[in-house]
């Protein structure tokens, strides 16, 4: 989500990004659900709220607290969703964050 949001903001062609990402993801089902629809203008491709993502990442961070390098990466991802929740976007679907709201 973060990568597609940044690409959208930078006016990078989402189809080209998706084509490259598919090659490295092993044709990920989650990527396909999000990207196919987002490229067509439908940002509701991944039915999981930002609030739920933040909750899950909070649990993951807690599990990783004894692995500092892994926890740092997880914390960075969590901060993206925390910022969205703080801006009142918690009820959006995570894939809706691709669009600039």
Identify the role of each PLM range.
Residues 1-101:
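Helical "substrate-binding/catalytic lid" subdomain
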């Amino acid at each position: 989500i973060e990568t597609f949001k940044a690409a959208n903001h930078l006016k990078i062609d989402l189809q080209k990004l998706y084509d490259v990402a598919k090659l490295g993801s092993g044709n990920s089902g989650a990527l396909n659900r999000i990207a196919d629809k987002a490229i067509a203008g439908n940002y509701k491709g991944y039915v999981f709220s930002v609030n739920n993502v933040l909750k899950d990442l909070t649990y993951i961070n807690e599990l990783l607290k004894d692995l500092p390098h892994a926890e740092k990466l997880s914390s960075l991802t969590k901060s993206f969703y925390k910022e969205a929740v703080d801006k009142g976007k918690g009820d959006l679907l995570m894939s809706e964050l691709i669009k600039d709201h």
